[in-house]
Amino acid sequence: MIIDSETKRKLREMNAAELLDAFERLDERTVMPLNHAEVVGLAVDNAYGGYTDAKIQRLVKRAGLRYPQADLRTIDLAEERGLDRGVLAGLDAGNYLGQRLNVAFQGATGSGKSFLLCALAESACRGRYRACYIRMPDLAEQVAAAALKPGGPAKLVRKYSTYTL
């Protein structure tokens, strides 16, 4: 779609570069039969999709996941693993987050608990919840270090209370 240079400058100045890119990606032949409202709607939908994808990627990166590529939708549900498809689908929906329910994993070493947890955190990030991955030994170390500082324990609690998961 053809946009004049002054409009491009204004969109960039307003930090709407994603919207500008979305307008530029629209094909003239595709948008010709559409009215202005439909063209703007297409461009905004396109820009919003890019915005949400970037936001999810930032949330996953900030979570510090051990396995950032983990995804509940692609977990192998082989019979011998004993994973219930319904339970995983329920966890992927994220209802437990709104209800403030806890999820606990138990199993032998190497059974995939960390991978499942990372997949759960990635799913929460897709739902735009803040998540943080920390191992218990690391958390215990942080608690011990915070205990030595004045106001340290309260600061540590505030830090982790900002995360939903």
Q: PLM features: residue spans?
A:
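Interdomain "pre-motor" coupling segment immediately N-terminal to P-loop NTPase/helicase cores
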Residues: R12-P68
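Conserved catalytic network of the ASCE P-loop NTPase/AAA+ motor domain
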Residues: N95-G98, A124-R126, R158-S161
